[in-house]
């Protein structure tokens, strides 16, 4: 895809109460996005932008559409029949919903880390090298360097450098999740999607992942879905609150958590429903 300049504003029309937009240029702009599971209208007229090199958190009760939205960003829904998206999702000015789009290239540019760690049943080294080989042919020495760099970026190198030939499944839950992050980083994405990345982890592992996310935003644009309000407040610059497939409110995280404009946002954050 070509790199072209893009506007950073979100168009008017059906949509949420939107506060001040995040500082800096937008990496992703969503325009009047609708998504359907068969006849079920799961996402309704979504408009927002993801700022480059920032963390955007998506919060809301179960079934509100936040994970569905995340899966639109890398066309994961294409793997399942009967699902479709309408509207525009612009990545550096190119609509990723274009049916002619190369999905392998898109998923290299937009990586995803899932709720439960999903290491491949292979060695730690091969977990990282596998994805690189899908897109590039490089020498063994270059591969060694890429594997080390990815593991260092995921704050895992020092823990596994002496056992790279051990199974990825032999690692602890928190280490497995960081291995999955390293695997995502290894193919050099531009955007990383995190879908409840800490829900299966203990508090210590969660703290490591949160610290890692804060470091990763220097190089990547990040979107995270979380049910943990404290986590959203800690890691993100912008927060989107979703309810029943609609984007209710979107703006700076501090504003969303301290003085939201919509009563439903306030009620959810304070635990009155959800």
Curated annotation (Swiss-Prot):
Instruction: Give the keywords, sorted.
Output: ATP-binding, Cell inner membrane, Cell membrane, Membrane, Nucleotide-binding, Phosphate transport, Translocase, Transport
Which subcellular locations apply to this protein?
Cell inner membrane
Q: What is this enzyme's EC? A: 7.3.2.1
Q: Name one Pfam family in it.
A: ABC_tran
Q: What residue spans carry the Polar residues bias annotation?
A: 1-11
* GO terms for MF: ATP binding; ATP hydrolysis activity; ATPase-coupled phosphate ion transmembrane transporter activity
The family database entries (InterPro entries) matched by this protein are listed as:
AAA+_ATPase, ABC_transporter-like_ATP-bd, ABC_transporter-like_CS, P-loop_NTPase, PstB-like
Catalysed reaction(s) here are: phosphate(out) + ATP + H2O = ADP + 2 phosphate(in) + H(+)
Q: Name one GO cellular component term.
A: plasma membrane
ABC transporter domain: which residues? 28-269
Q: How does it sit in the membrane?
A: Peripheral membrane protein
The cross-references to SMART domains, in alphabetical order and at most eight, read:
AAA (SM00382)
**Can you cite a GO biological process for this protein?**
phosphate ion transmembrane transport
Supply the NCBIfam families for this chain: 3a0107s01c2 (TIGR00972)
Similarity field: Belongs to the ABC transporter superfamily. Phosphate importer (TC 3.A.1.7) family.
Subunit structure and binding partners: The complex is composed of two ATP-binding proteins (PstB), two transmembrane proteins (PstC and PstA) and a solute-binding protein (PstS).
Query: What is the recorded function of this protein according to its Swiss-Prot or TrEMBL entry?
Result: Part of the ABC transporter complex PstSACB involved in phosphate import. Responsible for energy coupling to the transport system.
Q: What is this protein called?
A: Phosphate import ATP-binding protein PstB
Name the gene for this chain: pstB
